[in-house]
């Protein structure tokens, strides 16, 4: 029997675990165990699923173990996934059956593709990508590792999104052109509902229509 663990028993974990449960049943039948892994909630049950600590998950005597990280914070997601990979646990990609992934598309390990997501042709997506409900990635896009698309985020064609970027709910990224893509830099944050019409430097937060850098108020002394 194999053991499958969803790291993070919070909101996205609770949304994701039934998708994985359905996926495993279709692929493997009924001979498996599926749990949450969450050190804060260990020993409890969440939505009917047992919650294990990380240590208990790693020590559990199963034939094979698989995992995914349903934690929205990209830095925590990266830290957890890198740690668990060091223990030889295999990441599993989770894909809802009504999502659409076109041919000639490459998606890295550990992705979560939620309901009503579309990923178009000739796209390349890195590891542990989160595509939340009703988001889409259009043709010829390059998406890095640990990128998050919140619900309804829309990325049009010929866009490069670098590692650890966050695309907020309802945000729209304008298409680039061949050999001159629009670029969202590493760690950039695109705010909810933003309309991005030009490249965004690494580490910058933008919001509005058209999207502009969000300036911090001066700290009072």
Curated annotation (Swiss-Prot):
Its EC number is 2.3.1.227. The keyword Acyltransferase applies. Gene3D superfamilies: 3.40.50.20, Hexapeptide repeat proteins. The active site is at 139 (proton acceptor). Disulfide bonds: none annotated. It catalyses: GDP-alpha-D-perosamine + acetyl-CoA = GDP-N-acetyl-alpha-D-perosamine + CoA + H(+). Optimum pH is 8.5. One of its GO terms (biological process) is O antigen biosynthetic process. Pfam families: Hexapep_2 (PF14602), PglD_N (PF17836). It is an enzyme of class 2 (transferase). Catalyzes the transfer of an acetyl residue from acetyl-CoA onto GDP-perosamine to form GDP-N-acetyl-perosamine. Belongs to the transferase hexapeptide repeat family. Homotrimer. This is GDP-perosamine N-acetyltransferase.
């Amino acid at each position: 029997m194999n053991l499958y663990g969803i790291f993070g028993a919070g909101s996205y974990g609770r949304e994701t675990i039934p998708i994985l449960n359905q996926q495993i049943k279709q692929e493997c039948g009924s001979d498996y165990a599926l749990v949450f892994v969450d050190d804060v909630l260990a020993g409890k049950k969440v939505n009917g699923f047992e919650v294990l600590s990380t240590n208990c998950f790693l020590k559990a005597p199963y034939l094979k173990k698989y995992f995914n990280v349903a934690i929205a914070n990209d830095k925590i997601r990266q830290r957890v996934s890198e740690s668990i990979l060091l223990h030889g646990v295999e990441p599993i990609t989770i894909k809802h059956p009504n999502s659409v992934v076109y041919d000639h598309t490459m998606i890295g390990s550990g992705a979560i593709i939620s309901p009503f997501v579309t990923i178009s042709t000739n796209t390349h997506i890195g590891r542990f990508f989160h595509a939340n409900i009703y988001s889409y990635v259009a043709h010829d896009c390059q998406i890095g590792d640990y990128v998050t698309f919140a619900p309804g985020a829309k990325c049009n064609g010929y866009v490069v999104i670098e590692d650890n970027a966050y695309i907020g709910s309802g945000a729209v990224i304008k298409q680039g052109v061949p050999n001159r893509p629009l670029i969202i830099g590493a760690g950039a944050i695109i705010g909810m509902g933003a309309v991005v019409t030009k490249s965004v430097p690494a580490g910058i937060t933008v919001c509005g229509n058209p999207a502009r850098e969000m300036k911090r108020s001066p700290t009072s002394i």
